[in-house]
Amino acid sequence: MKALLLDFGSVISKSLFERHELIEEKLNLSKGTLTWKGPFAPETDPLWMAMQRDEITERAYWGTRAREIGALVGEQNWSMTDLLQAIGGERIYDKVLRPQALKTIAICKQNGLKVGILSNEIELFTGKEWVENLPFINDLDSFYDATHSDILKPDPRAYQIALEQLNVLPNEVLFVDDQLRNIFGAIKCGLKTLHFDITEPDACFDYVRSVMGIELGI
């Protein structure tokens, strides 16, 4: 493998399911107010299951959750950007980004491997300033965010853009994403893939490092 290509939301950043306590704390909501748990407890989250069946988009899912949370604090029509800024924005990178992801990115770079991001909506959800100040942004060899484009995963063109930015062949890349539809899209384009399980981040990044031929501490 010559390059690691990562989705951002839920892969590099912790999912909002994992941030329920932080959201409740920052917004002064009672503990346990947020009951939808996505893949951690699918039976609690019919909307999540609808997304998994491709009945709604990921953007629609999170847009709904943002509006619901906004309504709990008396705000109407909150977007994901509104929500994330309300709980701390760029001030809480250490609570939002997965340490396993940051370590893996750093070790890849130390070993001369390329690292890129292929996302559908980083800036849409977090805001431009938040993206520009990501602590690892200058370590990336490629960055494609479809916030300002109509070319979204799993459109084959999205993967092709990332491959061109990385200047590698499809079989030289490991692509990691938490959404199965995006994994299928990558497979069709010839990329090696890992369907990221957000309930097992340690195991997933252990696998990533194994495939990339690197280890912690190198």
Model-derived features: positions:
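Active-site neighborhood of HAD-like aspartate-dependent phosphohydrolases
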Residues: 1-43, 188-189, 200-203
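Asp-based, Mg2+/Mn2+-dependent phosphohydrolase catalytic module
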Residues: 1-6, 118, 122-123, 127-218
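Alpha-helical elements of Rossmann-like donor-binding domains used by nucleotide-donor carbohydrate transfer enzymes
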Residues: 18-22, 46, 60, 64, ...
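Hydrophobic alpha-helical core bundles mediating ligand binding, dimerization, or RNAP-core interactions
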Residues: 20-23, 61-66, 87-91, 125-130
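Short, surface-exposed acidic
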Residues: 27-40, 70-86, 214-218
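A short acidic, helix-capping loop that chelates divalent metal ions and anchors anionic groups
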Residues: 45-49, 125-128
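A metal-dependent, Asp-based hydrolase signature
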Residues: 48-84
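Short, acidic loop-to-helix structural element flanking the phosphoryl-transfer center
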Residues: 73-116, 156
